[in-house]
Amino acid sequence: MGIKKYNPTTNGRRNMTTNDFAEITTDRPEKSLLAPLSKKAGRNNQGKITVRHQGGGHKRQYRIIDFKRNKDGIPGRVATIEYDPNRSANIALINYVDGEKRYILAPKSLEVGMEVMSGPEADIKIGNALPLINIPVGTVVHNIELKPGRGGQLVRSAGTSAQVLGKEGKYVLVRLTSGEVRLVLSACRASIGQVGNEQHELIKIGKAGRSRWLGKRPTVRGSVMNPVDHPHGGGEGRSPIGRKSPMSPWGKPTLGFKTRKKNKASDKFIVRRRKK
């Protein structure tokens, strides 16, 4: 996937970049794998904002993705590589020999016509999914499960990858994209390869309107609000925040304040903390 640059014909286009979508092979998704996706706009069932800066954006349909990769021993062939508006990675449509169709995350170098398979007997090949115990040390993986059978939860964004570092009893050591080294049950599955569309992080939005197309609403600084709206608000002109450390809108310390729960149950699985 390449990056497309534009001539500065307008201020919005001056620094804007987009994907060239060279890897995409079709613009029509598989209808049987679509589901309706209603707008939440960051509200809960009471209509109260629980996530700020969300709302608007283009209408989308959800693509049902196979994160579990539990169709063991049945080979499938890549039919298309498609764009998914709900995630940064591209997706691949797999046609299995028994007639079933499924979407999977498209790893880097996966092409139309290639064969993929799941299960303990699958080869160590791009796009295949195996239990971690069957994956050799040093292999690059993505879409890693945290509990066997639950489906992949880690390393699913565009361009991300993890590496199998070693095996200790019923656990496997995995180094994640953040640098964190973590123990994962060896029965958990992972897919071989790096997630595709690795150029995604280089895209420049270019203008505010394009963020709105993506469903992102503006972020307003607390210092320009009123005291009733934010701890940093109020004062005459450009005033300091008046606190010994920056605060969130709800009065909690922020910017460097550790928010991870102390003595969290999963702490025992973290061998080395992520890089700062």
Swiss-Prot record:
GO terms for biological process: cytoplasmic translation. PROSITE patterns: RIBOSOMAL_L2 (PS00467). Keywords: Ribonucleoprotein, Ribosomal protein, RNA-binding, rRNA-binding. Residues 1-20, 219-276 are annotated as: Disordered. GO terms for molecular function: RNA binding; rRNA binding; structural constituent of ribosome; transferase activity. InterPro entries: NA-bd_OB-fold, Rib_uL2_dom2, Ribosomal_uL2, Ribosomal_uL2_bac/org-type, Ribosomal_uL2_C, Ribosomal_uL2_CS, Ribosomal_uL2_dom3, Ribosomal_uL2_RNA-bd_dom. SUPFAM superfamilies: Nucleic acid-binding proteins (SSF50249), Translation proteins SH3-like domain (SSF50104). GO terms for cellular component: large ribosomal subunit. Residues 7-20 have a biased composition (Polar residues). Pfam families: Ribosomal_L2 (PF00181), Ribosomal_L2_C (PF03947). Disulfide bonds: none annotated. Belongs to the universal ribosomal protein uL2 family. PANTHER family: LARGE RIBOSOMAL SUBUNIT PROTEIN UL2M (PTHR13691:SF5), RIBOSOMAL PROTEIN L2 (PTHR13691). Part of the 50S ribosomal subunit. Forms a bridge to the 30S subunit in the 70S ribosome. One of the primary rRNA binding proteins. Required for association of the 30S and 50S subunits to form the 70S ribosome, for tRNA binding and peptide bond formation. It has been suggested to have peptidyltransferase activity; this is somewhat controversial. Makes several contacts with the 16S rRNA in the 70S ribosome. This is Large ribosomal subunit protein uL2. It comes from Bacillus cereus (strain ATCC 14579 / DSM 31 / CCUG 7414 / JCM 2152 / NBRC 15305 / NCIMB 9373 / NCTC 2599 / NRRL B-3711).
